[in-house]
Amino acid sequence: MSTPPPKLLRALAGETLERPPIWFMRQAGRSLPEYRELRSRAKDFIAFCLDPEMAAEATLQPMRRFPMDGAIVFADILLIPLALGQDVWFEAGEGPKLGELPPIEALRDQVEASTGRLSAVGETLARVRAELEPDRALIGFAGAPWTVATYMLERKGSEREAARAYAYAHPDELDALLDVLVDATARYLVMQAKAGAQALKLFESWAESLSEDVFERIVVRPHAAIVEKVRAAGVTVPIIGFPRGAGAQVETYAEGVPVEGIALDVQATAALGRRLQAQGRCIQGALDNLLLREGGPALDARVDQLLAQWGDGPWIFNLGHGVLPDTPIENIARVVSRVTGKPVR
């Protein structure tokens, strides 16, 4: 008898399951003591991400601790600009820093070689797939072009205003940068699928505060182009798009980007999720990560509410944003147990 596909892949294929599959963004990270110990052994964060042994271990740590249905490869969205030739480093307490943005032509010249420079991520995926149980799905990911471009332009990880202003003042230059990132990102995702990723996710962390025309130009169009390129390369694994902060424009995104799954943030209404499900889309989300951190009866009530409002359609239980570093492990265990019905030690 053949083994059925993992629950997560069945949901992305449009199935309504007896319970939603579950995984959390940033489930591997500083909320886990074993992660903090592992991270202390690396000289810096970029080296940590590009060490397949360490990155594979970080990916697997939450899978050993919790009965999650999906493992997301441990990496970072800023590996793409690094591979394209822009300096990237992380400073303690300050987050990412980036060097001067190279000329567009210089970036374009590096696209073909960029995937090879990220081969360590492929090795990480292969290592994880070899150890991960067959009923648990392995997820690859990349930052979406606009989000990555904001870091490349701002050269840090805080404000977005300068990048948004650049989108208005220099539309042709931004479009050229996004085109480079579309090509590099599609190649990177294809590599991840070939290395063992069974689903792929595009993180558009900064889809908020964009007018309708700009949203179409710098979010919808690049995402659709990436999906087209990935499919043209023969990759058939499901893709999840995450236009975080898009609000009502999530439906514009759904109309324009042919992804199998759409991740929702905490703004998403029950009705929005149900409309997407009725269109045959799998939705993912959307527990508030702050509520996960705070815990208590309100957490239980919200989990139950989400199960009731979206449980009758294809849905993956997740957060609206990543696990916060100071989230108590017992709160994560509590939610996972409540959703899966499995005890968590």
Curated annotation (Swiss-Prot):
SUPFAM superfamilies the record matches: UROD/MetE-like (SSF51726)
**Site label Transition state stabilizer, positions:** 76
Major localization class: cytoplasm
Q: Which GO terms describe its molecular function?
A: uroporphyrinogen decarboxylase activity
Binding-site list for substrate: 26-30, 76, 151, 205, 321
* Pfam family name, one: URO-D
Please give the superkingdom of this protein's source: Bacteria
Q: In which pathway does this enzyme or protein participate? A: Porphyrin-containing compound metabolism; protoporphyrin-IX biosynthesis; coproporphyrinogen-III from 5-aminolevulinate: step 4/4
Q: What is its EC number?
A: 4.1.1.37
Which pairs are disulfide-linked?
none
As for subcellular location, the record says: Cytoplasm
Q: What does this protein do, in the record's words?
A: Catalyzes the decarboxylation of four acetate groups of uroporphyrinogen-III to yield coproporphyrinogen-III.
Family statement drawn from the similarity comment of this UniProt entry:
Belongs to the uroporphyrinogen decarboxylase family.
* Subunit field text: Homodimer.
**The protein, known as:** Uroporphyrinogen decarboxylase
Per the UniProt entry, what species is this protein from, by scientific name? Phenylobacterium zucineum (strain HLK1)
Q: What is the lineage of its organism?
A: Bacteria, Pseudomonadati, Pseudomonadota, Alphaproteobacteria, Caulobacterales
